[in-house]
Amino acid sequence: MSQPYDYIEMKIPAKPEYVGVIRLTASGIAGRMGFSYDEIEDLKIAVSEACTNAAQHAYKSKDKGEVSIGYSLYKDRLEIIVADRGVSFDLQELRKKIGPYDQQKESIEYMREGGLGLYLIETLMDEVKFHHNEGVTVLMTKYLEGEKVESGAKTISP
């Protein structure tokens, strides 16, 4: 696997009011890399959902922990990692619990809560991996259409 040409890492308190900072960062990075407007919007929604899930579900105490966000910039893709050290969950068990929504059998007013954010992340990103050994780590990948990387852009790495 190739090495990223730049890596950016941020840590935020696991509080919903900081998710906007991560959205803006994702938008700025994706724009610089050459993603389209629609792709940037997809990235913003996916990273927001992952961070919001961590802020709402990872830590049970009032002294909330933190969420780490890593952006790996490659020539052909952007990988975003959102990780917490809070309560883990089993994705397969959650999917069994919430099950698919069937509009023929269920009214929208009584739709089960939970899982929509995970569905959005998987739908909007090209690749998604969940790890739940220590806390939860979400690895999301969005590929560029062709070579849209800004040529001659100044980066941190040589």
Regions found by a protein language model. Give the residues of each.
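A general secondary-structure boundary signal
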Residues: 27, 48, 126-127
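Conserved beta-strand-loop-beta-strand hairpin that lines the nucleotide-binding pocket
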Residues: 1-9, 55-158
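Conserved ATP-binding N-box helix of the HATPase_c
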Residues: 37-62
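Bergerat-fold GHKL ATPase/HATPase_c domain
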Residues: 1-45, 150-158
